[in-house]
Amino acid sequence: MHLLPELASHHAVSIPELLVSRDERQARQHAWLKHHPVPLVSFTVVAPGPIKDSEVTRRIFNHRVTALRALATKQGWQIQEQAALVSASGPEGMLSIAAPARDLKLATIELEHSHPLGRLWDIDVLTPEGEILSRRDYSLPPRRCLLCEQSAAVCARGKTHQLTDLLNRMEALLNDVDACNVN
């Protein structure tokens, strides 16, 4: 289920392409749930800027696949089906996991908080009925920025940081994880 970093497209995606890609992901999620009636873990990489498919985003994606598989194994949850693909919005993955959706969401939130690359992961958990469980459902604060302690959404809207600073931070986090052999 891992993606080969050397095959990254480096395509600079436009806003309309990104919006279409998000709609397509939502349609894939609902089609997936019709064929796999257990909770769905759907995940992407948080990648600032127009290039969503790069060696860095694919390597981050691959770390997340490994971490999610390890989480399922640790919890004794069965992965019933899995898929990886690349869309205009970058690497995407889907795992059907036989586990209570609420437990899955809480475990993935903990993974996002505890893993060094967690801030770069966007992990959605959908119930078999298609309801997306949100961080807000658990009274959790929004994601924090990569560079400061503000809300990531506030910094993104205000363009608080230079894109190069964000991309350099992403790569530094990834290199640290690789150097320490963290999965």
Swiss-Prot record:
Species this protein is from: Shigella flexneri serotype 5b (strain 8401)
Pfam families with a match to the protein in the record: CitX
Function, as annotated: Transfers 2-(5''-triphosphoribosyl)-3'-dephosphocoenzyme-A on a serine residue to the apo-acyl carrier protein (gamma chain) of the citrate lyase to yield holo-acyl carrier protein.
Catalytic activities: apo-[citrate lyase ACP] + 2'-(5''-triphospho-alpha-D-ribosyl)-3'-dephospho-CoA = holo-[citrate lyase ACP] + diphosphate
EC number(s) reported in the record: 2.7.7.61
Stored HAMAP family: CitX (MF_00398)
Keyword Cell inner membrane: no
The keyword Nucleotidyltransferase belongs to this UniProt entry's keyword annotation: yes
Family per similarity comment: Belongs to the CitX family.
GO biological process entries: prosthetic group biosynthetic process
Name of the protein in question: Apo-citrate lyase phosphoribosyl-dephospho-CoA transferase
GO molecular function: holo-citrate lyase synthase activity
Keywords, sorted A to Z: Nucleotidyltransferase, Transferase
